[in-house]
Amino acid sequence: MTEQGNLPTQRVNISTQKMLGGIGYILMLLGWIPGIGILLSIVGFVLWLISMYQLSNILRKPSIFQKVLIAFILSIVGMVIALAFGLMAGISSFATMGDETGAILGLGLGVIVANIVVYAIILVAFYFYKEAYDILAQATAHNLFKIAGLLLFIGAITIILFGLGALLIIVGNIVLVVAFFTAPNEVEVKGT
């Protein structure tokens, strides 16, 4: 234990948590594989979530996990809203089968509103992920977490520009995996 700015610090080992995070994130990214991809994504998400929870506790930064949890809940809300609008649009198109103009207008307007609402929710969710990675970067003195969070957030903002946003999200995901595996095994934690 050392003294740093009148606050005692101690070195803590985060090697298990960073491995869980890195492996979990890789598994989440394998969701596109037919058949087993969904299972890999779920297992990966659980590993990543455990990693973020444990890092939050070990580093004495509860806001890391709080922000991850808020982002996750917002992502779920966004998916539920998208699904609800999709179902409502489908049902309304059947209800107006005799009136093609009304059906097309209602369906189009529903899709536009749903996209705007979901886009706004996803932006807020990605902002909270970015904030969590900023805190993690500061706590571990490993700036790749901050860079990954920024790339993911900018990617979410620019996703409406088709390829650019998707490309930034892909790069952000790769940087995040690298950040987990290259983070230091031991870090200084302030407090008792």
Residue positions per predicted region:
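Membrane-interface extramembranous regions at the lipid-water interface
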Residues: 2-32, 40-81, 101, 121-156, ...
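Membrane-interface helix caps and helix-loop-helix hairpins in membrane proteins
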Residues: 34-35, 160-164
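Membrane-helix interface motif
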Residues: 80-97
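Extended assembly-interface regions of large multimeric machines
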Residues: 83-87, 101, 105, 111
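Flexible coil/linker segments and helix-coil junctions enriched in charged and small residues
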Residues: 94-106, 158
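Hydrophobic alpha-helical transmembrane segments
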Residues: 105-122, 159-162
